[in-house]
Amino acid sequence: SEMCIRDSPYKHAKGEGNYQWNTGYEYYLYGYDQRSMGYIDILVPTSDSDGQIVRIICTHFDHCGIDQVIQQQEQNVVTQAGLNNPEYPTILMGDLNVGWGTNVLPEFRNLGDHIGVSWVDHIFAFPKGRWTGHDFKSHSCPAANGKASLSDHDPITATLVLK
């Protein structure tokens, strides 16, 4: 019932820099996962005494296989993080549940540079043309001591340089 959902201990923290979608009651009825986007603004040291603020976004899109759902989540991120006109240089990474050759992420591809992908895990940099990226890697993380792995995805890394 709705009361059980409201009283559930499984809640996401929300506030500045944290946004969710798929939160309506109808989503619980049909078994959709809640998905979210979080970001943090960090001050990166530079040769300039003031440094540079960079926004880092992490997100996880639905794995429903429906392009329109993925595109709606992409639009949510573009809107919530201000990617049309980013306040700061921005790096977005996460499980977007679409592969390399997809045309499902038109907003990200139009507004930013696609740094790399491993399976469905992507790194994008915004605004377009402000970053160079190299050394994109997926790191194998086998289970330790016979225990289950923490995730079905291996971590990804890249070196990004702000121009």
Residue ranges and their predicted role:
Residues 26, 61-67:
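Second-shell loop/turn segments in exported
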Residues 6, 33-35, 70-75, 116-117, ...:
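A structural signal for well-ordered alpha-helical scaffolds and beta->alpha junctions
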Residues 81-91, 96-163:
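Metal-dependent phosphoester-hydrolase catalytic domains
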Residues 34-57, 67-105:
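His/acidic metal-ligating clusters that form di-metal
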Residues 1-2, 6-53, 135-140:
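Structured beta-strand-rich core segments of catalytic domains in phosphoester-bond hydrolases
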